Amino acid sequence: MKFATRPPRTCGEAARQAIQCPAMARRGSYLLISSLAGAMVSAVAHAAPAPATATSTLMGGARDAVEAPGEGWTIVDLGDAWAPYPLDGAARAGGDVLPRYRQTFIDLASGRFGGDAMAAEDRALELFGVAPSLHLVLAAMDDEARHRCHDAIAPGPLLAVKTPMRREPRERAQERRRALERTRGRVDAALRRHGVGSVAELRDLNPSYARLVTTLERAEAVDAAIRALQAHLVCDGLMVAGAPRGAFDVTTMRALAAFQRRNWIVGAGELDGDTVDALGLGSRELDLRLALRVLRVRVADAAGLIEDGSARGEWGTVLGRQLDPAELRFQGPYPALKNGAADRISPATEAAARALGWSDFASTRAGLRALLSGTTRQVAVRLPSPPAYDRTPLELRAVIDRGDVVDADPRTRRGQRLARAATHRPVLVVFAGEGADEVALVRWPTTVGGWKDEKLSSRRVVRRYKGSDLGARAWRDLVVAPAWYPPSSTPDDELLGVRDGKWVLKEDLLGPGYRSAYGLVMLIHHERVDHGDHSHMLDHGIRTHGSVSYRSILTGSSHGCHRLYNHHALRLATFLLKHRRYAVRGPVDEVFARTVRRPGQRWRIYRRDRGFYFELLPPVAVDVGAGMTSRACES
């Protein structure tokens, strides 16, 4: 491991000490794009340290010669070998070994799942923090057969859906369809009996027929919506074309969940408002929004941006489009922070998009074709000027507001009553600057501890309150691709699941990986203990970390840790590493072994890769507030 004994005097010394120097820039080949001059692109070659020039064909057919960019330009990597800064550039800047998970991340983003059955089943991983490569985005945009398939589906049945539709048990689906056929038969018989030619005429005959027609219309609307949904899922290759239609079964639910993941929707396979809206946009518009979201990831990572407008409850748009659904802009009843930072990510993404010549589906597809057929995937763009507070190193602190804390087990009647009354969810706020100049950069939903099952030494499982630490803490260790080593108190059943009808070990929960219990990034909460002439850091097992358990972030609790969406955790890690000094500690090998049992079966867990560690210098102060404990009189 490498540690700094004093601040480096030069960037060269920073590299030797494995300490990142934010001013350092990597030389290479990239495209130069000016947002002021519209869509101007040309190839530039660099021979470090002297900048070079080159001439190439510009977008639109013009030709020009440009110099290598200097002050005011941001280099954005749009290639397939890109990985987020914590998995790549942060260690590379210190000349250190790269995290082992980097190549796995790149493979997953390119749709190469190897032997990872869970990733292959998840398919679209953007919602879990792994945005697809632009080659995959372009392949979707170029799939005209898929677009025509979607175009042929009438929008009416889905637009008529007013309440969420969910998976229905097989028996209920069969009975619903039998009832539909019976109702159709009754209506047909009534039409023949009275010699009328339409259900509208039949409705007007008497109130009884009016009720019968209304029943038929409602049943047919449900059936038509399910069939239209399934047709869209077939177009996207998420369902088999010849599969039975008309029942919202498990197959449909899983296919819809994959559609939701691909289109940035927090869902579990239910047909809700966000999903209906997405289906109504059309496949070309959805692919354009996917391209813009991927560009947003790359731009925010390159520029080290974190400000998304959440601190003031005002999220910007990109090319007139709100790229995030309401659940990913969750703020609850909290008012805007007076010192909240404006959204910087959306304007930066729009500047990059316009500089690339992206304005609609056709121009974006053409731009991607040109970019990905060229010899370089790096572009240099002029982004909006940074605010005065944005400097490096940046004074930072974080506050976790626990919100309304329910102190009773939600499985009890009292706990359910308190949970329903709780309105303020836990939030994480990151501040920059000091005193009157302090700015709130983001305010994101998170979790705090709650009531969970715990295994005793006798192997008996009991319910216990797993609270979060309160008071002053510090983020010192930042870990990317962390593995979760379940404590002995974790019940064996929580480490097992059923797959293809068989009990299996939840390898993905252990990690490293996007489905790890710690997600793609974790920050350890240390308590500083002073002893006069020296101090030491205590680790109580609490972390701020990424997670794919998005529903828990919005409505649930944790075992004491503070969960974030994986993309938020990655963005936070990138921001910290680009705005603070740090030491590269590298991979930490720590052996973990445990036997997991259920009647007649046993599994052996073995891990030795705990994750890739960075040490923030100095640590970032974190204050975990008590929140407002919900209490009620016992009846």
Enumerate the language-model features and the residues they cover.
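N-terminal pre-domains immediately preceding structured catalytic cores
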Residues: A47-S635
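Bacterial N-terminal signal peptides
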Residues: Y30-S42
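Positively charged n-region of N-terminal signal peptides that target proteins for export
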Residues: A25-R27
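Low-complexity, intrinsically disordered or signal/transmembrane-proximal segments
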Residues: Q17-Q20, Y30, H46
